[in-house]
């Protein structure tokens, strides 16, 4: 099992996230773009990702929350901007409320997720762009790296089940 690699660039407020998964591009793409599969891996344990609405298309969105073991809900919204099927998609991600309104008290970010065949499976490269160095630092302090790596471990388990 591969480990998630993070490269921060404070000169352009980006974080490059790379991970290889043992699955085909089609399997990994589905896991990132279908709500029933996202529910199986997106949230770091012991949280669960619960989709309220999802419309994976340019101009669509994914409105979801992470449900904590104590019943707490952390709402998020991902607006899909551009999609090249089975290759990449971009989106604007933000914390939100249950109605889908952005929570401007917490930093948002722009994602470009790229899927390529390589090695034993599929390499996913995520370029996360922040509005400022301070926003990148705040998200990092909130546990982004640890949480995303845990979610990636969940995805590894899901891909084994999909074989």
Features from the language model and the residues they span:
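Hydrophobic ligand-binding cavity/cleft-lining segments
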Residues: 1-48
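Short, solvent-exposed aromatic-acidic interface loops
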Residues: 94-99, 127-134
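Hydrophobic-ligand binding "helix-grip"
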Residues: 44-48, 52-58, 67-119
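Hydrophobic pocket/interface hotspot
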Residues: 28, 38, 62, 80, ...
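Short, flexible helix/strand-to-coil boundary loops that buttress conserved ligand/catalytic motifs
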Residues: 32, 42, 93, 140, ...
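A conserved amphipathic terminal alpha-helix motif
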Residues: 131-163
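Solvent-exposed residues in well-ordered beta-strands and their adjoining turns
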Residues: 20-24, 67, 83, 116-118, ...
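Lipid interaction determinants
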Residues: 10, 102-104, 118-124, 146, ...
């Amino acid at each position: 099992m591969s480990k998630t690699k993070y490269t921060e660039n404070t000169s352009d407020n980006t974080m490059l996230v790379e991970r290889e998964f043992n699955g085909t591009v089609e399997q990994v793409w589905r896991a990132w773009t279908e709500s029933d599969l996202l529910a199986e891996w997106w949230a770091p344990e012991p949280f669960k990702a619960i989709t309220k609405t999802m419309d994976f298309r340019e101009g669509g969105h994914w409105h979801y929350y992470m449900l904590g073991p104590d019943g707490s809900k952390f709402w998020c919204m991902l607006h899909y901007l551009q999609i090249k099927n089975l290759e990449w998609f971009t989106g604007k991600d933000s914390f939100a409320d249950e109605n889908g309104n952005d929570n401007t008290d917490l930093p948002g970010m722009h994602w470009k997720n790229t899927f390529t065949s390589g090695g034993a499976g599929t390499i996913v490269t995520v370029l996360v762009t922040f509005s400022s160095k301070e926003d990148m630092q705040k998200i990092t302090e909130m546990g982004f790296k640890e949480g995303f790596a845990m979610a990636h471990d969940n995805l590894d388990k899901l891909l084994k089940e999909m074989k």
